[in-house]
Amino acid sequence: MARREKREPIAYILGRKEFWSLDFEVGPGVLVPRPDTETLIEEAIRLVPDRSAPLRIADLGAGSGAILIAALKEFSHATGIGFEASPQAYDYASRNAARLIGARAEIRLAEW
């Protein structure tokens, strides 16, 4: 209760947040994925209806990796790269990518 009284996000307290039916690790140093951001994935599906298209997806400012990883889950033959300048967010994105999508996602600590 003390952490909530200090207005710490519930996702930080739990250490996780669901996004696009996937369970992402989150905490201080990374933005919590928001449900309204899922509209980006919906729009990608609308624009590219062939979910087996061999896409290469880039995510600039990857944060937790939620957008890139969700897109890769939907596009089964796609690969992607996420760039993140924050070392803390990079760590979260790297762990989430390794656990949820494997070698199809590469996360780089870099300014873009």
Q: How should each PLM-predicted stretch be described?
A:
Residues M1-L47:
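Conserved AdoMet
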Residues T39-W112:
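Conserved SAM/SAH cofactor-binding pocket of Class I
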